[in-house]
Regions:
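Conserved beta-strand scaffold positions in the cores of enzyme catalytic domains, especially
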Residues: 23, 82, 108-110
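Electropositive phosphate-/nucleotide-binding environments in soluble metabolic enzymes
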Residues: 40, 58, 62-66, 90-93, ...
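Short beta-strand segments
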Residues: 5, 82-86, 112
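Active-site histidine-anchored catalytic micro-motif
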Residues: 89-126
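N-terminal glycine-rich phosphate/adenylate-binding segment common to multiple enzyme folds
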Residues: 65-96
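Short, well-ordered coil/turn elements that cap or connect secondary structure elements
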Residues: 18, 77, 103-105
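N-terminal glycine-rich anion-binding loop in soluble enzyme alpha/beta folds
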Residues: 2-64
């Protein structure tokens, strides 16, 4: 079985590798440029941008259905468990569930963690 979560779990790349968890990145847009959280930009980079441009704001968007489909298809021969950020806070759960629906021949379970941040990370760790 392979476990997926989204970058809202705040797992470091090292922790994700240790747990053998695949992290699906949220998209962050700052000053018109979009980054994949934990891939193209990291918290320290965001902090630096915020200090350089204190009047600018970041917008976020959940991973798309296509993001999930692409990753799920890479693991077509494995059972997949996806633990997502709370559906009450984001559309990440909906994206993952829609992707699973599009791949009926794969064994994919999508779980709404109903939480965020370190609490989501702890669920993934257990």
């Amino acid at each position: 079985m392979i476990i997926f979560t989204d970058s809202a779990a705040n797992l470091s790349p090292e922790k994700a590798a240790q747990l053998k968890v695949q992290v699906v990145p949220f998209h962050l847009t700052f000053m018109g440029k979009t980054y994949r959280d934990g891939v193209d930009i990291y918290p320290k980079d965001l902090y630096k941008l915020y200090t350089e441009y204190p009047n600018e704001f970041t917008t976020t968007s959940q991973p798309s259905v296509g993001d999930y489909v692409s990753l799920f298809e890479q693991h077509a021969d494995e059972e997949i468990l996806t633990i997502s950020l709370s559906s009450g806070l984001s559309g990440a759960y909906s994206s993952a569930a829609s992707a699973a629906h599009l791949l009926p021949n794969q064994k994919i379970t999508v779980l709404d963690s109903r939480t965020v941040g370190p609490a989501l990370g702890w669920i993934v760790e257990v």
